[in-house]
UniProtKB/Swiss-Prot annotation:
SUPFAM superfamilies: BAS1536-like
First-tier enzyme category under EC: hydrolase
Enzyme Commission code: 3.1.3.-
Membrane-traversing stretches: none
Taxonomic source organism: Bacillus subtilis (strain 168)
A Pfam family per the record: SpoOE-like
UniProt signal peptide: none
Protein name: Aspartyl-phosphate phosphatase YisI
Amino acid sequence: MNSKIEEMRITLIETAQKYGMNSKETIQCSQELDILLNTRIKEEMIFGRYLENSRM
């Protein structure tokens, strides 16, 4: 997951440099990165809860 996030972050930077910060291409990349980050956060929260419950 981390490599996908890093790849999308680089793509976002390159897209913003090429098309501008407010272009539809940049916004789309930003939204895709948001999805990846939110998924990672949810997975970490779920895994953290699993670890807490397994210690009980």
